Amino acid sequence: TQLLYHRYKTFNGDMSKGLIIFPCELIFLNGHKLKETIYQYIELWNLGNEFKTWFEEACGVYATLVDRIVPGFPRKDIAAIKEKLQYDDNLVVQAEVFHLWVIEAPQEVAKEFPADKAGLNVLFVPSEAPYHERKVTLLNGPHTVLSPVAYLSGVNIVRDACQHEVIGKYIHKVMFDELMETLNLPKDELEKFANDVLERFNNPFVDHAVTSIMLNSFPKYETRDLPGLKTYLERKGELPKGLVLGLAAIITYYKGGVRADGAEIVPNDAPEIMNLLKELWATGCTKKVTEGVLGAEFIWGEDLNKIPGLAAAVKADLDSIQEKGMLETVKGIL
């Protein structure tokens, strides 16, 4: 807001000096959220109706969606990369070749920002909603639940999870039998997208650590998987076993401790979530753990204990994981 106001004052409200803004925060309709926030600051700081009019008419704020798997710094290969470059670059970022940037804006904006002319996969579309729903549900959703299931089974890389005899079947079940059933898009289109996602998960050149995905798992589940769980229950009259197990796996991961192979389990989330899980697991009672997590409205925005059968199903999975281990529990739902 201050940047825009300074520009407005510098150019004396010249309507040709507005800016085109593409916010990149990973939230739905980020452009709409940014506009709302700017309006709030205009009011809060009493910047005036003339500036507000200039912002509305001279500037454009457009929602965007980015789709690319970016594991980050390639620690395993950095020595070879430095040797090839012949200099030290500590800002190297590993990413898959696939990329998509969807911008909800008219074609006039595309003329101002012709990224597609540079060979980049950038789409200017009337609505980002279908792209957002498809990506969040069939890429981010599986990521969120497969990661704790894989990690607690001793598997550290997404690709290895997909190729695992048991976990691979679990991922396929969640994607094709559960999450796909909740989307209102042509089935052939969804199947193609899901198969493309699996191909990306299996990328032999990208070692995507599941621990990097598990950061802030509860908020991720709330946005990526919970809507699908609710829709599936509404349409099928039963809970999706894979998504329920994914939630139980997240809760188990936040217990901490040590894996069977001796690796230390180190969850990472907001302090209030970490403290809640620590207190609940200290009771030693999976019923209290389940009801406490599902009832945490500061996580979910509601009491998930009210979803028919969910508490009992999550508790049953927690008990099974404690008694039989993760892999045997996964086998039980396939």
PLM feature spans:
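Substrate/ligand-engaging "lid" and interaction regions
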Residues: 1-334
